[in-house]
Swiss-Prot record:
Official protein name in the record: Orotate phosphoribosyltransferase
Reaction(s) this enzyme catalyzes, per UniProt: orotidine 5'-phosphate + diphosphate = orotate + 5-phospho-alpha-D-ribose 1-diphosphate
Family label: Belongs to the purine/pyrimidine phosphoribosyltransferase family. PyrE subfamily.
Pathway connected to this protein: Pyrimidine metabolism; UMP biosynthesis via de novo pathway; UMP from orotate: step 1/2
GO cellular component: cytoplasm
EC number: 2.4.2.10
UniProt binding sites for orotate: F34, F35, T128, R156
Amino acid sequence: MTDHRTRFLQLALDADALRFGEFTLKSGRLSPYFFNAGRFDSGAKTAQLAQCYADAIDAAGVEFDLLFGPAYKGIPLATALACAYAGRGRDLPLAFNRKEAKDHGEGGTLIGAPLQGRKVLIVDDVITAGTAIREALGIIRAAGGTPSGIVVALDRQEIASEQDRRSAAQAVAAEAGIPVIAVANLADLLAFAAGNADLVGFREPLLAYRGRYGTDTTG
């Protein structure tokens, strides 16, 4: 497992953003783990998280020249990532959307750098159903930008339904024709748990969950 994946999972565990136990998801599934990016709630935590994102993006080799953060969690993530890249000597333009259009001031739903003619990387925490990402894709194209990829913190690598054996990330990637980059995924989480004495007891529930809901790419 590459270093940024290990660093991210340890950071998430330390921040209580990654928790183990029994959690009922919005889908109704009973999950042995839960991820909440909202727990990266300080400058230091967010800065470290952004470095993990940047390392994952660089490892993937995707080409982009603008960062876009979908409202709401994508906004601070994209902003922190832009700061991380500035610290590496790459000053990237940044944009995001608001969910409610304004009829005064700058107006509209878009804030930040113009998207026209840009290769846009979408930055978010997770892809659950894909609704917010699909909305972001439409906004970017309508503004004259070209989506070039999507980056998220964690890919749960679980099927959308028994009828659609793809994950939400796989479905969005196929529909949009662009890569979805994850800082870490369920397979990484399993490897991380196996190497952590405090988490070994959660490995069997994780394996059982993957066996029931995992995509074909989690093995």
